[in-house]
Amino acid sequence: MALRKRRSVPDASDNPKHVPARASLPAPRPSGSTKFMTRVVMSFAMIGGFVAILYGGHMYAWGLVVVLQTLLFRELVNVRYRAAAEKNIPWFRSVQWMWFVVALFYNYGDSFGAFIESSKIRFVPPAIVHYLRYHTWVSFTMYALLFVMSVLSLKKGYYKYQMGQYTWTIVTLGLIVFQMKYVLTNIFNGLFWFLFPVSVVICNDCFAFFCGKLFGRKFIKTPFLRLSPNKTWEGFIGALLCTIVYAFFFSAFISRFSWLTCPVESFEFKLIPDPLTCTPHDVFLPHSYDVPVFIARVINRSQIQLLPIQLHSFWFAIFASIISPFGGFYASAIKRTYHLKDFDSVIPGHGGVMDRMDCQLITNCFTTVYFNTFIRSRIPSVATILNLVVKLTLEEKQDVLQAIQEMLQS
């Protein structure tokens, strides 16, 4: 009796050792100094491009974030990509990208609506009002259709592989889409709330490198983290102290520029937008603070004048120094699991976009929570109330007007 022939393509395994490496020709390794110079040059190029985009305005900054999220999704999905299997699964990659598009559509529409409700924008274009009115329904319809399509795309012999890929897709969307749900709100509240947290994380990363190189394992021999053996306690502590100092002074410096501190007040897109002007938020105005007695004796002053944002900057520095690095450690765990040196080579000297953004994702989430809890006013603005009144019928508007008149008379 002939033995039954097994299928030619076995059910895929999740063992990372079975993930085939991409074939590439051996190339000569660049020297350490060449790699360092490439890294430095690209760092300054990225900083210059970032500042130029910020100067272009809020919409350009939002566009940058969407591009980065797209590149991040591509890199993370490619971590588990297996060309041999997916050649036999038509439309599978397309379905993954559809999930990404639907997630972006829902997230940005939801955060866009939340921003309008709490902003000072007095006029919202009818097209945007119509979009927000049906946004949730359209998002759910897209989700339902895509859910059905995903189930129909499952192919016998590849169930385990496909389910693993879908699970990884959901994790990826959680990292780069839902964790950054309110990045649009941060940008529209003022580019300060986008630039400052990003710069604090970059500062901490740089100082951790230099402090680790200068003082690493000279005072504390205990390994910092087995997941990242090159990290040292000296680098971690030194970066914390340096980041606190940096955040204190840099927050005061960029508070001078109204185009960074002013929120969006209209949705008119211009290729070259006009400079923003506004009444500064209270956190960007100087206040007098009493100095503790033991410090007052040293500086011979009982009060000092600071910007409230300089005091808030302390918590941004603490978070960027203690919590944000774990985003990098998590990314390192992914690379170790799948035997990768970098997520990609799109940025010479730096690797992939994820290699540079791993610590930024959770910091953006922190910025949103911190701003809404400690910075944003809980008193509704006039613009917020007017946006609600516009939605009322004529009779309801007359009732509101009469109620306001009675309040003023009393």
What are these regions (language model features)?
Residues A2-I323, I404-S410:
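Membrane-embedded alpha-helical bundles of polytopic integral membrane proteins
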Residues F319-I323, D344-P348, C359:
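Transmembrane alpha-helix interface/packing and boundary motifs in multi-pass membrane proteins
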Residues Y60-W62, V77, A333, F374-P380:
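Transmembrane-helix exit/juxtamembrane "anchor" motif
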Residues A239, H312, F316, S324, ...:
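Feature representing long, continuous alpha-helical segments
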Residues R217-G238, L340-G351, V369-Y370, S377-R378:
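Functional transmembrane or membrane-interface alpha-helices that line membrane-embedded catalytic
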Residues I295-Q305, D342-V353:
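Short, membrane-exposed interhelical loops at transmembrane-helix boundaries
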